[in-house]
Amino acid sequence: ATPSNTVYPGNPNGYESPETTHYSVVDQWGNAVSVTTTINLSYGNGCIVEGAGFFLNNEMDDFSAKPGVPNAFGLIGNEANAIAPGTRPLSSMTPTIVMKDNKPFLVVGSPGGSTIITTTMQTILNVINFEMDIKEAVCAPRFHSQWLPDVIQIEPRGLSQDVLSNLRLRGHKIIYRGGYIGESNGIMITSEGLFGGGDCRGETSAIGY
């Protein structure tokens, strides 16, 4: 985190990302936390709390304000996720701790709006099914599908041409996503110690002391 006494008025792009934040932490005793925090869209709802200096979120967009109409992330909801008293909206945030033998094995998560779920799932599968180390797992190419719109989004280097051809033969529509999908980070806990991985796509990094 950036110490508050080093933040001054000016161009915030040098020290602050416009997207959701995720961090994974494990301490010397093996306690693990996976935290995803967000104000949803850039600048939240655009209102600053007077005297406090922070933006209010616009997480109301995670509700289906108008069933059948996509929200800011292209997700199409229905009446089950409608705005109503005493309810909470659906969220794509997926801070995750994977257990193995009743102990934390993976601590992972990502920013990325509606791509968070697929990003986190692919990171976990990369470790468990494809036996990657955590750095390889968070940096590997990714794809995303959220049912509606019914397309498969891929990064420019996301899938091989033979896989793309087979998907198209099965009737899938493939589109190239501008930019990257997610920005995962994670920690793998083994008998040999802790191994951290920061996604190559952005400013994510792994540190330990």
Question: What is each PLM-predicted segment?
Answer:
Residues 54-82, 96, 104-105, 115, ...:
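Signal/transit-peptide handling
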Residues 42-55, 118-122:
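A short, polar/charged loop-to-alpha-helix boundary motif
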Residues 113-121, 134:
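Short, charged, low-complexity patches
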Residues 44-45, 65-66, 116-118, 162-163:
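Extracytoplasmic/secreted cell-surface and envelope-processing proteins
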Residues 50-53, 74, 123-126, 154-157:
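Short, charged/polar low-complexity linear motifs in solvent-exposed/disordered segments
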Residues 1-38, 51-52, 59, 66-70, ...:
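Internal maturation/activation junctions in enzymes
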Residues 40-42, 112-113:
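A short acidic/small-residue loop/turn micro-motif
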Residues 1-17, 29, 62, 82-92, ...:
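C-terminal catalytic domains of large/alpha subunits in multi-subunit enzymes
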